[in-house]
Amino acid sequence: MCGIFGYCNFLIEKTRGEIIDTLIEGLQALEYKEYDSSGISIQGDELKSLNIYKQTGKISSLKEEIDLYNLNKNLPFISHCGITHTRRATHGGLRRANCHPHNSDPSNEFVVVHNGVITNFANLKALLVAKGYVFKSDTDTECIPKLYKHIYDTSIELGYNLDFHVLTNLVLKELEGSYGLLCTSSHFPDEVVAARKGSPLVIGVKGKTDMDVNFVEVEYLDQEEDYLKLNTQTKSSGNVLAAAPVKYNTCLRKSPPPSFTIPEKLYNFYIQSWLIHRNASRERLAATHGILFVIRLCITSAVCE
């Protein structure tokens, strides 16, 4: 069992030291006796750069690893997104290369932390290796950031300018198995994408002023009505991986987007498992076709963390 944690501050100045401390505290809250490594990704000194630090052993070993780099912990960030991970070795043994976060390439264009199992990772890895990607680990997770980069680069070549949310949907469409994941990217600074399939996620928002929050509720239908099919097509071959289009019977209905105001205190948003396992028929749908749930929290005219 792995643990993932992310922290974002928007329009609230925090020093790098404060950000690292918050991320480490989040990791410590996820500590349990069987984890064997941990890692962290934060913004670098240069704009749109991401740094990764990871180490086997306890979280104290990760803190020692970070200290070796003599980072400027007084460097301020008006906005910043950082992600962290504790790992128990499953795919791949206990070695530093297998620790999370995993990256898409040496420049860390896409960085991912992940809890779950990608069951088709061998096929994805073979495809990506054929495209020239070099894998450093034995994990199933590493295929995710490299898939992000492959789809992103391909979309640019095809003339598409995808936002982070649309790009994530294209990536998730290719993944089989279960996941709770966080992804950051140098192409989308000050943004983080959270997605889950079978693994609950919790989002907490804290601000000094009231905030308007909008979100979209989704319900998976047994019949095809007022739905958005999950196999979104592109103008080229229908799939940026040039594979045959996949047909899903799973249907998605969007309810009217509710909105509400968050008072001046911490609120937690629980993405519960009941959405997937409400009854046996939906359980079969989840097992057969998979259910995607991408979290997108839109905060209007607010400063928050």
UniProtKB/Swiss-Prot annotation:
Keyword Transmembrane: no
Pfam families the UniProt entry points to: GATase_6
PROSITE patterns, sorted: GATASE_TYPE_2
Organism: Saccharomyces cerevisiae (strain Lalvin EC1118 / Prise de mousse)
Name by which UniProt lists this protein: Putative glutamine--fructose-6-phosphate aminotransferase [isomerizing]
Functional description taken from the UniProt entry: Involved in amino sugar synthesis (formation of chitin, supplies the amino sugars of asparagine-linked oligosaccharides of glycoproteins).
Catalytically driven reaction(s): D-fructose 6-phosphate + L-glutamine = D-glucosamine 6-phosphate + L-glutamate
EC number: 2.6.1.16
UniProt keywords, alphabetically: Aminotransferase, Glutamine amidotransferase, Transferase
InterPro entries: GATase_2_dom, GFAT_N, Ntn_hydrolases_N
GO MF term set: glutamine-fructose-6-phosphate transaminase (isomerizing) activity
Domain Glutamine amidotransferase type-2: 2-305
Biological process annotations from GO: fructose 6-phosphate metabolic process; protein N-linked glycosylation; UDP-N-acetylglucosamine biosynthetic process
Residues of the active site: C2
Gene3D superfamilies per record: Glutamine Phosphoribosylpyrophosphate, subunit 1, domain 1 (3.60.20.10)
